[in-house]
Amino acid sequence: IVTENIEKVLFHSDQPHGDFSFFLILELCKAAHKNGVIVAFNGDGPDEILTGFTHNQNFLASQTRTNFPLVEYFNRICFMPETHRELLLNKEFKENIINPIDYFESILSEWRDLDPIDQIAAYECTSLGPGNNLIKTDRMGAALSIEGRSPFLDHRISEIFAKIPQTQKLQNSVSKFLLKDYGLRFFDKDL
């Protein structure tokens, strides 16, 4: 699916991107378009708001084992380990760029009063979501004239989710526990 869609994905995403899920979302949108869908709900939001990403769970597990600085989170979400970054960047380049860790910490400074995992959730909701995750469904849907709606990002729902204590968001190593538990009321548990 990559070779036949790469030009379309690059054109509609408006930038080169290393995220393979653009292609998967485009394929999903093609199937929806073929079936006459013009407006579709997506599931964007709960991973960011309810700290449902695997790296969030790893962060929480590490927090329970040791005092884990947020710099470690930054290094986990980077695509390249710091040792490799150091090998690729020459001295002149390094002198003229913003230190990514300093920049990351300046973003998080707005949420210094929150627990580290809640700082990460705030960052992912305000930076990662709009800068990456929401772009995928929006632009790949638009490529086929499909309007995507994100009901979990309604400010009323987001505000409720944000008030839920972290201990209730991840239970028994199940991410988005409350959402999944609530959803089971509507679906067969054997699905």
Regions found by a protein language model. Name each.
Residues 187-191:
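Short, surface-exposed acidic
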Residues 1-120, 139-186:
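ATP-dependent adenylate-handling active sites, centered on carboxylate activation for C-N bond formation
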